[in-house]
Regions:
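Surface-exposed amphipathic alpha-helices with a cationic face
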Residues: 20-27, 49-52, 82-83, 111, ...
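Structured C-terminal cap/extension of enzyme domains
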Residues: 148-252
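Active-site beta->alpha loop and helix N-cap motifs at the rims of alpha/beta catalytic domains
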Residues: 1-99
Length: 252
């Protein structure tokens, strides 16, 4: 569970139950990456260990939020959580939400740990991502955390995207990445641009409000958001529905 899965309003018990349910459901067909981030290192270590015990294949660890820390603190925090979990780790850099950025030099230091081998980059700063790629090379797999920057990050050696749009249009996001990997950059760029109206609709309010509404419209029982998140406005509901229809996701 991450941002889109509303992990911030789930209890540990709910989060672990969701991980276990997913592990059992996919039955090794695809890896299960469990969100286990925390701004309390001791709590994060416990959650990392329990997530691994539930059968997760890897952990997605966001930077500490609110209390934050120094770059040296980030190294200590993530190192402790990686060792507590004992399974591969993807770092999650989303300073717009946490108020804390993983500097490229810090990413390089963390990439030396044998279990820390990926980063979800949602800083929106392409120059920073380029520096991470240059400093870390193959030691750190880069994944876009922004749906509107998939192709730019792939062009810098990125391995894919951890996506919001894919919750409603998985084939579109997959095809964009696959086209790039197949060497058809023109098609990849075209599909990246094709995603823009959906991206604008799915971020017309804070994520995951719009995407959960969209999933419910499409017949997926995503339920309601928990407070403090509320339903989208009527105007935004209409915008989301129009974008889904334009993308061919709502069948007449």
């Amino acid at each position: 569970c991450g941002t889109t899965g509303e992990c911030s309003t789930m209890t540990d018990e709910e989060q672990l139950a969701a991980i276990k349910y997913t592990v059992d459901l996919v039955n090794h067909r695809v890896p299960v990456i469990a969100g286990a981030g925390s701004n309390d290192t001791d709590h994060g270590c416990a959650l990392a260990a329990k997530s691994a015990a539930c059968g997760a294949d890897a952990l997605l660890l966001v930077t500490p939020y609110y209390n934050k820390t120094s770059q040296a603190g980030l190294v200590a925090h993530f190192t402790a959580m990686a060792e507590a979990g004992g399974i591969p780790v993807i770092l999650y850099n989303v300073p717009s939400r946490t108020g804390l950025n993983i500097a490229p030099e810090t990413a390089k230091e963390l990439s030396k740990h044998p279990l820390i081998n990926g980063i979800k980059e949602a800083s929106g700063n392409i120059s920073q991502v380029a520096k991470v790629a240059a400093l870390c090379g193959d030691a750190l797999n880069i994944y876009s955390g922004n749906d509107d920057q998939v192709v730019p990050l792939l062009a810098l050696g990125g391995k894919g995207v951890i996506s919001v749009v894919s919750n409603v249009a998985p084939e579109l996001v997959h095809n964009c990445c696959q086209a790039f990997f197949d060497g058809d950059t023109a098609k990849a760029c075209a599909l990246q641009l094709e995603m823009l109206p959906l991206e604008e609709a799915l971020f017309c309010e804070v994520n995951p409000i719009p995407v959960k509404y969209a999933m419910n419209v499409l017949g997926w029982n995503a339920g309601e958001c928990r407070l403090p998140l509320v339903e989208p406005s009527d105007a935004h509901k209409a915008k989301i529905e129009q974008a889904l229809q334009a993308a061919g996701l709502i069948k007449e």
